[in-house]
Amino acid sequence: MTEAIIKIRGLHKYFGPLHVIKGVDLDVTSGEVVVVIGPSGGGKSTFLRCINFMEEPSDGTVEVDGLEINAGESLRQQRKSIRELRQKAGMVFQQFNLFPHMTTMGNIIEGPVTVKGWSKERAIDKAEELLSWVGLSEKRDEFPSRLSGGQQQRVAIARALCMEPTIMLFDEPTSALDPELINEVTEVMERLAEQGMTMVVVTHELHFARDVSDRVILMADGGWAEISPPGEFFTNPKEERTRQFLAHIL
């Protein structure tokens, strides 16, 4: 059996008295695409942000590519490990979060130069390769204000990939886009999956979940309602909660 590259055990997250993530476990193997769907307020985005400690879990362990962080211990004493984990876990957000005062190229090379210590020349070479891959070579010198939403999100994907992560996390990457721009982003994500990138994706794009994922998770009320392969999840779900959810959205 393939070793899991992401291992999550007993993950909890509280916001004050509000128990948002309720002790979830998850293993994701190398090259696997796991899609998390579910009703709003179910904890999907918080769960994803806990994987790379953009949100600090209240308890539990998160392991990415052999590096484990224990949220039950002092996170301050694990800051170095958290920084290392974040470099392993690329993240693409709902809002593109590009620096408005930087060009496309500047946005992509900022992380490798300032965080990884790459030379500017090395970072530019890698960025040009990625811009070609996402179909935006001609936009390298444009500022974000001159790009469409779909183009900005493709730049954000290139920016994350330029850090050479071992896994990619996508937090509703198409929900801020006009409908006609969604496909240009999901097509890039599909090609990334075909190349064997390990991905955890929170999305409302059910066609992506159905056609690209290896497993689909229904997350509701801070926990897993169902985890199944997409064929089973969408055509013969095991849980009544899943059937109710699908009946509302299909």
For the regions a language model picked out, list residue spans one by one.
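Catalytic Walker B motif of ABC-type/P-loop ATPase nucleotide-binding domains
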Residues: 168-171
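Short coil-to-helix segment of the ABC ATPase nucleotide-binding domain corresponding to the Q-loop/switch region
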Residues: 102-110
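Helix N-cap at the start of a conserved alpha-helix in ABC-type nucleotide-binding domains
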Residues: 179-181
